Structure formats: C-alpha cells, structure tokens
C-alpha cells in the first residue's frame, strides 16, 4: 500500500533558507570585523593556564589587570614590529614602576619576579634596573610566568599599539 504524501510547495522553504543565510552572513561579518582568535603556541607560555583567547578589536579601553593584545614595536631581532603579543596590563599612566633583578613593582605592589630571560638575552640583569613614571598613553604589561618576555625587558607600550581586550577561552 502506498502512502500518499501531499506535495509541499518549495517557495516557503526557499524564502526561509534565504533569510537564514542572510542572518548568518550578517552575524558572521560582524564577528569577523570585531573579533580575532589568538593562539599561544609557545612551549613556555607567559599566561600558563590558557592557550586560546578571544580578542575584541573594538574594546581597547585599558583596564588594569585586564588581558590585552598589542603590536610589538622595537623588539627586533626577537620579534618583528607588528607581531601580536598578549599580556596582562599591570601599569597605567601615572603609575610608578621600579624594576630590579629581584622583582618589578608597580606602585609598590609586586607584578613580576626575577629576570629569568636576561641571560638568554645576553644582558646583565642589572642592565634592566630602572625606576620610571608611566606617561600619558603608556602602559606596563606583564606575563604571569617568570620567563615571560614583557615590559620589564622592553619598557612601556603606547596606547596606539593596543589591538584589543582579550578573553581567555581555554
């Protein structure tokens, strides 16, 4: 015995499919304009608990202790200018920074310890020692690992280098 099926018109399905495709295209375009995925492939990560980050290109407003992606500048030969880096913002304009071989203090609070990379860089630990006040549009970035290549080695990052706020995914 044959079951009779009523033939359904294809036009309503085509309209729904077109609307769905347009919505997906708009949402996809918005996401591609606003967000990037950052993946830390280093063996020794400066932020040890996370490998993948969502970077919000439209959120560049600096907030202390936030994670930010920024473009490197003047770090050759280790990194080409424009290399995207990701660190924790630990110093804002007006903050007092003191760097010694033992630790880095921002307004008297320790944000990093030691100079684990000084020997690899071929520079004496004491060469990085300094005290400074962060100027307008200058930000201090730190990694959480002792081996993080961060502001203690290369100084402050300018506001225009900041790419966007980063959120850890996994």
Walk through the language-model features, giving the residues of each.
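Solvent-exposed loop/turn segments at secondary-structure junctions
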Residues: 60, 97, 104, 147-148
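Extracellular/periplasmic metallocenter environments
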Residues: 128-129, 134-156
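PP2C/PPM family metal-dependent serine/threonine protein phosphatase catalytic domain
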Residues: 107-126
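Protein maturation boundaries and topogenic segments
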Residues: 1-84, 133, 152-170
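Mid-length scaffold segments of soluble, non-membrane domains
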Residues: 80-111
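Short, exposed beta-strand/loop patches in secreted or surface proteins that constitute
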Residues: 44-45, 89, 96-97, 131-132
């Amino acid at each position: 015995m044959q079951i009779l099926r009523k033939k359904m018109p294809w036009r309503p399905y085509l309209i729904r499919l077109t609307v769905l495709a347009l919505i997906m295209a708009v949402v996809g375009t918005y996401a591609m304009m606003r967000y990037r995925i950052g993946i830390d492939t280093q063996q020794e990560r400066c932020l040890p608990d996370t490998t993948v980050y969502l970077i919000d290109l439209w959120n560049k407003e600096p907030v202390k202790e936030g994670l930010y992606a920024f473009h490197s500048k003047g770090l050759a030969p280790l990194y080409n200018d424009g290399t995207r880096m990701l660190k924790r913002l630990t110093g804002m304009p007006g903050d007092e920074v003191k760097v010694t071989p033992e630790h880095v203090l921002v307004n008297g609070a320790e944000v990093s310890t030691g100079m684990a990379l000084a020997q690899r860089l071929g520079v004496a630990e004491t060469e990085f020692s300094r005290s400074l006040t962060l100027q307008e549009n200058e930000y201090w970035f730190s990694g959480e690992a002792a081996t993080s290549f961060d502001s203690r080695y290369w100084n402050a990052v300018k506001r225009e280098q900041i790419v966007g706020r980063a959120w850890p995914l996994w």
